[in-house]
């Protein structure tokens, strides 16, 4: 089964995935219409800064077993047997945050949601864009990612590709393959900026 796979070494922190995610979860599924919606749609993928300010797109891994599901006291969090996606029923969520405390990745957020009763704050996380994939589209975050940091693929195929990259790297005794030149240059500049900042502070 396909899923969104994260390649953090390719992330440039542009946050287009966050914008696309919010728009995809708007009632009208349109960025421009989303601005006028109440409650305003929020992204379910979040880009944070890692080492050397490297971007990291953090999203739900739909763990199996899922710690959030096991911690949910009301049974609001469940796994869809057809898609293997961990979902949240907003009608049953009581905003207790037990799921957030159990999640090892910190991906749950709490805010008003279009699918929830008006004015109710509920737990929200990635739903693998199930509505989009049911129509034959790929998840919004992977669709807009131009660097390959987020790809929609079979896990086995993605792992085989990683193995090939490692094998090529070892056999050629060079740096990792598959990072676009512009991304590699961007990462080099980020590292130089961090080093320069440290030198100035001394």
Q: Whereabouts are the PLM-identified features?
A:
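Non-ligating segments of multi-cofactor redox enzymes
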Residues: 1-202
